[in-house]
Amino acid sequence: MRSDKIKLGFDKAPHRSLLKATGAIQSDEDFQKPFIGIANSYIDIIPGHVHLHDFAKRIKEAVRKAGGIPFEFNTIGVDDGIAMGHIGMRYSLASRELIADAVETVVGAHWLDAMICIPNCDKIVPGMMMAAVRLDIPTIFISGGPMKVGVMADGEKVDLISVFEGVGEYSSGKIDDARLKELENNGCPTCGSCSGMFTANSMNCLAEALGLALPGNGTILAVDPKREALAEAAAKQIMTLVEKDIKPSDLLSRESFLNAFALDLAMGGSTNTILHTLAIANEAGINFDLAELNTLAAKTPYICKVSPATKNVHIEDVDRAGGISAILKELSKLDGVLDLSRPTVTGKTLGENIADAEVKDKAVIHSVEDPYSATGGLAVLFGNLAPQGCVVKTGAVDPKMMQHTGPARIYESQDEAISGILKGDVQAGEVVVIRYEGPKGGPGMPEMLAPTSTIMGQGLGDKVALITDGRFSGGTRGACIGHVSPEAAERGPIAALQNGDKITIDIPNKRIAVDLSDEEIEARLKALPPFEPKIKRGYLARYSQMVTSAGSGAVLKSFD
């Protein structure tokens, strides 16, 4: 066992003495058992994580009962909703790298034999996945589970996005104080990751397709007793993975990631999933061209529409309808979409995992013969405005905005944009541009949920497009195009735009362009002053210097 390095031999007496002091070692026989790291992410200020302290206790008990010795440690976390709309959001994406490094550090320093990862919300899931791939020890993921949907007094279903959009409705006089307060009080009714197909839930669902989690990981509610049963099953299964030495490198391949992308396209997951999946694949030494996603999308139908793409279906409905296994089972009817032979943490192949799955509600999970659209719910656009690509959640775009041409309204930051939108500056037909908010420029590529929700709340969702080198919340809906690469801080073409420039967005044909010649773009870029970092000390200053583009997953530069 790996852990023998810290526990066996006469020279390890000091190590054993320290280990006995933890209370985890109850007898000398325990030194003959595998040491299992419990990578938890309990934190009081994130509703998706407030229950993970007790959740981890149950997992530790199950590990010990199964013959392992559990050692729990915690990572940091950022709640994207609470960090939204102010400087705090700059820390969100950057926290992913800290989490990956922190998990690597604890496991690497203490030579743990295996790991159970307990993430839930946005950056914690991919951060732990990156660490798991990097460490390459037997690992299983068990998330904390989704939140229940909120219900208003009149029976209307609401979620966090309803509250954000309520701010826009309130600012434009569409609702009063009482309505906004009711939304506030009902949007997030329980612990768990927010109830729609937002980034956290999207990533927890993708863990099933990647083969890193047991079936049910992405959709069983945090407050459902089945979640605790799944956690106990994961604790038992980690011992099997240790016994058979099944590691992430045995499970993850290019085909595994394509399976995850196919699921993402079929359920219209968050655009952030592209960023994170690229980063996880990078850790595995697997590189993807963003154009590959469009090729896959062309043969992957969009069959499960969940909030924010619709207001009446949430993650709990997907679970009731058969869960991720049912979506994958439906996709398996199509040739060339899934590789069902890929191994998973269950000890079975993906195909074996979903063999008995069935769609229990066809209003929630459509058949491949009757999709919402014949192509996937995400797309990558290319053109002279985004030579390296940009992404859009097509499943959440109003049909009227799938093709749009309009004048640019430029904002140099998210704060400037929010102020302008709230003042009523944005007019129907315009293309709002928010720049210098990319991985380097932000820094941290902040999410744009506040401006997009305000636009929706003001009734402009089918009249205005928004493009940015930043990114969007998984809860964003509308013609919102993010991850524009290269970013403005790297002298990307988005930095050359001026108010009134004509921008054309053509989602069906995967194109985005500004009506300027290459020569004009180049001349404007040459005339710009050097980029001046917004933050010059601390972690974000270092992050800004080391981060790469969104097109490569916004990972840190390699020094290999």
Swiss-Prot record:
The modification N6-carboxylysine is found at residue 123. Binds 1 [2Fe-2S] cluster per subunit. This cluster acts as a Lewis acid cofactor. Mg(2+) binds at residues 80, 122-123, 447. One of its GO terms (biological process) is L-valine biosynthetic process. HAMAP family: IlvD (MF_00012). Belongs to the IlvD/Edd family. This is Dihydroxy-acid dehydratase. It comes from Chloroherpeton thalassium (strain ATCC 35110 / GB-78). The lineage of its organism: Bacteria, Pseudomonadati, Chlorobiota, Chlorobiia, Chlorobiales. The gene is ilvD.
